[in-house]
Amino acid sequence: MKHSLSRFFGLGDKEHPERETEIEAEIAEHDTLKEEIQELPVDTIMPNRFQPRTIFSEEKIHELATTIHTHGIIQPIVVRPTEEEGKYELIAGERRWRAVQTLQWEKIPAIIKDFTDTETASVALIENLQREELSAIEEAHAYARLLELHDLTQEALAQRLGKGQSTVANKLRLLKLPEEVQQAILEKKISERHARSLVPLKLPELQIALLQEIIEKQLNVKQTEERVVKMLEQKTDRKPRPKRKAFSRDTRIAMNTIRQSLHMVEDSGLKINTEEEEFEEYIQLTIRIPK
């Protein structure tokens, strides 16, 4: 984790570049400086405000608690002091902390670090991303938060995480879907591929309607994609079809260039709405960009 974190912190603390070296040293010492480990009261520790995980499996927490009860805590949690004296905020190790609570232990071994909000958020986000246990929506929110914290492009973020840019872009597109669809992914009522199939519909009311149909009829991904195609065809059929003139070569090139540019804007994470209408003498392209 050290390599990924140092690269992020180097970008995230632009006013104090020397912090990159200091933080690398702190992370490297994590497992070696045993004198830093302290026994902290469990009830003095609060969850990480930047924790990307919103759902914790009670079964997994119980399994971890059983392991801890048998073998103890092998790796201490990491915390930072809060403004309230004697209180701490988790940086890493929330599952261990929750497991210890179920065991009703009074204290837990911890390492105290002096991290900023940006550093704390980055540790929490990257630690969870590397565990690959997040839902698609939680992962998407983690990517969005890292982009915001470190002022990165999607391409730069993908490089730093060792992932393909398309992987990051596809996850971020999920955040453009209505809240109902995102919640269905979190609750595992539909898969990520189901959700991605809904993106071309664009209109939230159509996406929600098909979501309900997927759940009620238990449609698989292929069936969902077929329904999307039909819904798009029906949407097109409702529009009046003007008499068409043949497109000139220059017009085709211009439209293709505009469409490619719009795709690039969408891939950057900006949600835009577009609508094309053909008239007898011209093509009208309406673009709505949020402020």
Swiss-Prot record:
Belongs to the ParB family. It is found in: Cytoplasm, Nucleoid. It comes from Bacillus pumilus (strain SAFR-032). Coiled coil: none annotated. This is Nucleoid occlusion protein. InterPro entries: Chromosome_partition/occlusion (IPR050336), HTH_ParB/Spo0J (IPR041468), Nucleoid_occlusion_protein (IPR023705), ParB/RepB/Spo0J (IPR004437), ParB/Sulfiredoxin_dom (IPR003115), ParB/Sulfiredoxin_sf (IPR036086). Effects nucleoid occlusion by binding relatively nonspecifically to DNA and preventing the assembly of the division machinery in the vicinity of the nucleoid, especially under conditions that disturb the cell cycle. It helps to coordinate cell division and chromosome segregation by preventing the formation of the Z ring through the nucleoid, which would cause chromosome breakage. GO terms for cellular component: chromosome; cytoplasm; nucleoid. Its main location: cytoplasm.
